[in-house]
Amino acid sequence: LRVYDKLAGKHYFKYFKKDAFLSLNPHIRQDKFLGASQFSDAVTDDSRLVMRVLDEAIHDGAHAINYLKAESLITTEQGLVVGATLKDTSPQHSTHTYDVQAKVVVSATGAWADTLRMQASQQTEQTFHKQIRPSRGSHLVVSQERLPLNQAYTFLHPVDKRAIFVFPWENRTVLGTTDLDHPPLDDTEVGITNAEVDYLLTATNDLFDDVDISRKDVISSWAGVR
């Protein structure tokens, strides 16, 4: 963290001894730590960021089409990618496909990138060397009345020592994230599992004193694959 401060040219890092930290954060369990460090990080509204990028792209001449899946790549006999077969996955037209030719095809498919890479390489599932390991991250949202916070916390899970975050967001409190290998990707909607809910609740209740957050306190959840 001190190295980050040095690179940024600003000083955000600060260390608190146990008594000093507890005076500012009395709801933290006293038997769980010896001290704490303060640092600065970035935050963004990912939904608004996506919409802003789409708006800017459309303004510059792009066409943004929802519910359109890159089903497969169109290649020449020499293996050159010259387009893609697109599938309309909207409920009204779930069987329609369209072949679109292009001078350049850019794959910005995230965790699904290996699927198109395998097609472009014309290899099989058995011979293709995958470079992407899909991982699922899930979060819980509870009310600020049940877990009032005025700043974000990062700490280690008591079971597997993974980093967990708890932070205030839009008059709510967010608990997250998990990090699990995701099964082979398909069109199934990604969602949090019961085991992940228990995992996040265990971590939160271990850090905060007399909170006892349970499933009935969960307002909503979300999950994503990276």
Question: What would you call each of these model-derived segments?
Answer:
Residues 66-82:
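A conserved short coil-to-beta-strand element within the FAD-binding core of flavoproteins
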Residues 22-60, 83-85, 92, 99-100, ...:
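Helix-loop-beta segment of a Rossmann-like dinucleotide-binding subdomain
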Residues 86-94, 144, 157-158:
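Short acidic, glycine-rich loop/turn motifs
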Residues 99, 103, 107-121, 126-226:
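Active-site substrate-recognition segment that forms the wall
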Residues 68, 88, 202-206:
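Flavin (primarily FAD) cofactor-binding/catalytic cores of flavoenzymes
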Residues 1-24:
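Dinucleotide-binding Rossmann-like beta1-alpha1 core, especially the glycine-rich loop
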Residues 80-85, 150-151:
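Short, hydrophobic/aromatic-rich segments at coil-to-beta transitions
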